[in-house]
């Protein structure tokens, strides 16, 4: 399954908008910033004060499996951080499938990143 950066932007913005409704713009922005893993490619994702995410590059490029893993790690950390403020935050996101890409790439098993990697490895 091939995803483009623009697919990630759409999914991340859905998650950001949902979080913004619960946590407010300031906390959502801080959560995105504080949970971003130290991976240079992720620095291309910019978040403005209204918590809209953009990408400073070619959004029609395909995303590699390695890049998807970094996005998954970031999303997992972001949701776990939000769960410290809102009870059942991760459960609500999972049940409503907020920001999910086709095949559940971003949010399926958000509470267990290692399970996600294991399942994807078995499928290959």
Q: PLM features: residue spans?
A:
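Long, compositionally biased intrinsically disordered regulatory segments in eukaryotic proteins
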Residues: 1-124
